[in-house]
Structure formats: structure tokens, C-alpha cells
Amino acid sequence: MEMAKEQEMILVLDFGSQYNQLITRRIREMGVYSELHDHEISIEEIKKMNPKGIILSGGPNSVYEEGSYTIDPEIYNLGVPVLGICYGMQLTTKLLGGKVERANEREYGKAIIHAKADELFFGLPEEQTVWMSHSDKVIEIPEGFESIADSPSTPYAAIEDKERRIYGVQFHPEVRHTEYGNDILRNFVRRICDCTGEWTMENFIDLEIEKIREQVGDRKVLCAMSGGVDSSVVAVLLHKAIGDQLTCIFVDHGLLRKGEGDMVMEQFGEGFNMNIIRVNAKDRFMDKLKGVSDPEQKRKIIGNEFVYVFDDEASKLEGVDFLAQGTLYTDVIESGTKTAQTIKSHHNVGGLPEDMQFELIEPINTLFKDEVRALGIELGIPEHLVWRQPFPGPGLGIRVLGEITEEKLEIVRESDAILREVIREEGLEREIWQYFTVLPGMRSVGVMGDYRTYDYTIGIRAVTSIDGMTSDFARIDWEVLQKISSRIVNEVDHVNRVVYDVTSKPPSTIEWE
């Protein structure tokens, strides 16, 4: 995405580290815009972005492996400060004439370094705890570099070429385990790259409105409303930018939460005076999904059918050229890049037909979920709408595991409504980042009254997170869980067992499909 010249930016190049998105987050938390891009990005593209600094992420490979990831060495001649992290430091060393070799043993975990009073470590104590994760080590630094930190296992825990403003650290400052990691990154971003830290949601709105108006001109836009927070924020942002040129199409695919369809029409159609067309397409989606149990196939079908519905509706309108979606930055990252295996196809990223008749507008595809909520508040959307539970584009279609039926949808819909009601009553809405129920499709034996039952199991998923990239299961009080379980088995037909998901992300994803 080409950024406006007046916006300061730190470019992060991706070498496949599990932590690379954390680098981007940490920088944004400092009020400086940052984007993650593939390491193969061209010099010309980098110049267009006009970054204030470049960070080379870590990665799982060795710089000497065949086909290992690399960059155009011209990056070091752009006159822009560069910080290499772990693999990024080793690659910098190799490309600029130093030596890297395989370590006798992998260094993983906490380590103590001794740092010099340098720009990168400005204002920090000499002795610091850092997080190491590497199997190669630098044994000779390039000409013009000096060591600015060492540890018992390496004389080159951090290096710098002060004249060219090129830096490297053998540890991960972006993770919480590194004691002064945020301070080190802040020193690079604010002191070395001279960023002012003025990136705010207010500024984002101004820049995005300008870009939307420039892209759209006097043409018309369709906004895909799913009922979730993301598409709702996109709709309000677009309406602020282009007013009546926007038509929102709310596809009621029969995969929504209880009462959601009516809520969308009331809150956004009437509350924001937006032009919303509600399309009842339940039968159409259910026909396409009949007999389909593979989660990837379900996502693709739902994504395709969404666009086909828009095609049908657009044909009834005149001069519509654009389709707007609520794609998030996490969607883009998780759908895979050259250095990351696809975890799952996101509805707003994969599943779009090649012959789609619209040009896409994705105004929040550089934002994380918490940033989207902040954007929603800045746009004037009421807090109770902004803090609604995250809801995937495929809706309950991926919370019914396996083949979707009307009966299974109703079970998930009713159990989810009970869960949300109890969480709200207990005042836990802000403490738990996301919570929902799933229907695994398995049956088990139970006893209700004097009768043996053989009915479905409901799974409860509740997690704490900041941005959805990583998460932990929520420690909900047992009495609250018991209340939820009791209500579900007593009030929802065909359910005799409730289980609680206690896995983190990773290794699991938040959604079950």
C-alpha cells in the first residue's frame, strides 16, 4: 500500500519470524506507522514508500542455507537507518563482508548482555536481560562496524556502523521477555530514525478519507456489511468520505448471530442515515454449502457466494465500480506470504473469484483489531457497537464444524446468545477479548431426567488478546462457567454436554475452523 508522503513510516521486512508482526505492533504503539512487507520488495518500491527506517526481522533459516532469504544490498546505501534483528543481523553481517557460522549449540531463551552507552541503548542500564533465539552466530563483523553489546556466549550481541546508521542485535527486542526491548526499539525509531510519533487514528482518518476520495472520484461504492465490527467501521469511514456515493449491501446469509440482522439495519441504516440494502440469501448459501464439510472449502464457497450476491445486486444499480471490505492486517498476515505458510484462508482475503467485477477498497487492511476499535470510537460509533464481539465473515458457518444444517446453526445461535448474555451480566465483556460457542459435531451419552440421551456437545472458546495475533484462554471463574453450562444444556435442544477450550494461540487458532 503506497503511503502518503507526509506520514512517517518504519518498513519491516519479513524473513519468516514468528515475531515479525510484533515488531510492527510495537512501533505503532509508539505512535509511528509501520508496515510488514516481503523481503523481496524492490528498491524502487521502498523509495516510493519513503520510510524513515528499515527493520530486518528474524527468521528460522540459516543465512548459508541454499535458497535462504536475502535482500537487495542496495538497501544499505539508501541513507536510511537499518536495524537487523537476529537473522536480520546475520544477513547484514554476511552481505557487508563479515562472517557468520553455525553455533555449537542453539542459543534459545533468556540471556544477560552488557551494553555500551550508545544511541541504540541510550538511557538504559549496562546489564540487561534479553531473549535469544538463534542457531548461527557472528564471528567477524564487517569493516566500519563495532560491537556495542556482548554476552558470555557472544562478543557480538549488538553491533553498529555509526556513520551509515546500520545496526544489528542478536536478540529479539520485540518480545516481552527482553527487559528493555521497547526502549531499544524506541531509541531506534525516535532517536536514530528521528520519528516524531504523531501517528493517531485522527490522522489515519484524514489520510484514508483523502485516499478514498482520490481513488473513487465521483463513482459509486458497494460496502460488504457482515454485521461485524470491521465491516461496520469500514462503512462509517466510507460514508464520512463519500456520503451518498456509498451503498451498503448487508447479506443476510442465514449464518448470523441471534438478532444480528435486525440490529444492523436499526443501528446503521437508521442511526447513521446510511443507504443499506438487506438481501435475504439464506437459501442460496445453504444450497451451496450442502454436503460440504471441509473448512477451507466452506470459506471459499461463502467468499465466492458473497461476491456473486453483490454482482447480482450491483446489476440493479448504475455505475458501481468498487467493492469495500473489512479486511484486517491480521487477515492479510495469516493468509500467508512467501515466508509464512497459509494458516487458513480469510473470508476477506481468499475465496474471491478471478472474474470479480469490482475493484476492491480495503481501507482498514493495515490495522490490527484493537486499532479498528479505536478508529470506530474516533468515527463516533457508540462504544457498545465498537466493542461487539469479533465475528468472522463466514459467520456461524465456521462455528458449525463439518457440514452445516439448519438444526446445527440454531444450536450454535442459541448457545452463543446464552454465553454472551451471561458474560454481559457478569461484567466480563472488556476482560475477555473474544468469546463464542462452537458445535464440533460430536455426540455423547448423557442422562436428562430419567432418560438416556445421545446429543451434541457445545464447545466454549474464550480468549484474552491484544490484536488477535496471539491469545491465551480466558480464566473465567468456575461458577460462571457452570452457570453458562447449566443454561445451555437446559435451554438449548439437542445439547447434553459443554466443554471449555483451554488452548492458546499458537498452537491453536482462535476460531476452530
UniProtKB/Swiss-Prot annotation:
Domain Glutamine amidotransferase type-1: 9-198
Record bears the keyword ATP-binding: yes
Active site annotation, chain numbering: C86, H172, E174
Top-level class of the enzyme under EC nomenclature: ligase
GO MF annotations, alphabetized: ATP binding; GMP synthase activity
Transmembrane regions listed in the UniProt entry: none
Protein's UniProt keywords contain Ligase: yes
Superkingdom classification of source: Bacteria
InterPro entries: Class_I_gatase-like, GATASE, GMP_synth_C, GMP_synth_GATase, GMP_synthase, GMPS_ATP_PPase_dom, Rossmann-like_a/b/a_fold
UniProt KW keywords: ATP-binding, Glutamine amidotransferase, GMP biosynthesis, Ligase, Nucleotide-binding, Purine biosynthesis
Alphabetical list of CDD domains matching this protein: GATase1_GMP_Synthase, GMP_synthase_C
Pfam families to which the protein is assigned, alphabetical: GATase, GMP_synt_C, tRNA_Me_trans
Catalytic reaction list: XMP + L-glutamine + ATP + H2O = GMP + L-glutamate + AMP + diphosphate + 2 H(+)
Subunit: Homodimer.
Protein name, UniProt field: GMP synthase [glutamine-hydrolyzing]
Organism: Staphylococcus carnosus (strain TM300)
